[in-house]
Amino acid sequence: MPQEIRLINFGGVNCYLVKTDTGYILIDTGLPNKRTDLEKELESAGCQPGNLKLIVLTHGDYDHAGNAAYLREKYGTRIAMHYDDSGRVERGDWNWGLKAKPDRFSIIFRIGAFFIRPGHFDTFKADIYVRDGQSLSEYGFDAAVLHLPGHTRGSIGILTTDGDLFCGDLLDNLFGKPGLQFFIDDLAAANASIEKMKSLKIHTVRPGHGKPFPDGFIDEKSAKKQ
């Protein structure tokens, strides 16, 4: 049966709660200063300690990993992410693993980063390091991991068997037109990730920022937008 997906948005950052036959999967965890709001959303959906099977982080930025350590402790769950972003969450160093000069660092991103006040970040070590193509069926989630570097080295996507792609911060949809995210560390890697996505059966793209959009927007302009 189709898995129920709940979009949770606070401060322009998306988390996704997926209800499966055996419990819940949380994709990304939002900003630390939105923790109380996030917990209320989880509770209202029926997610509680004992039935949150897994937290999956699309990458290691503070606005996506900000509540992971807390939720792991409270809900008795595990955290999964790609190893190539591990230093970001273990050290709380948001420059870790990035180029000295990222390929795309737009003024819109700089303004947004200036105004965001994330709150205290609890560093942590992930329980599971996922790899490209890895199935998440053992957690009751009919989905597979896609390594989608570009925004960061360890960025991943999650593609369900129903064609829902959680793409993290590779793409966004903040101004009504989906496109490449405003911060891209490695543009060549991002282009390769877009090409990879084009070859897959995707129905809906669910980004880390902005509203979900149909897969028809994944075109060459998305990857080559400067």
PLM features per residue range, with description:
Residues M1-A45, G157-G168:
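Conserved beta-strand hairpin/beta-sheet module of binuclear metal-dependent hydrolase folds
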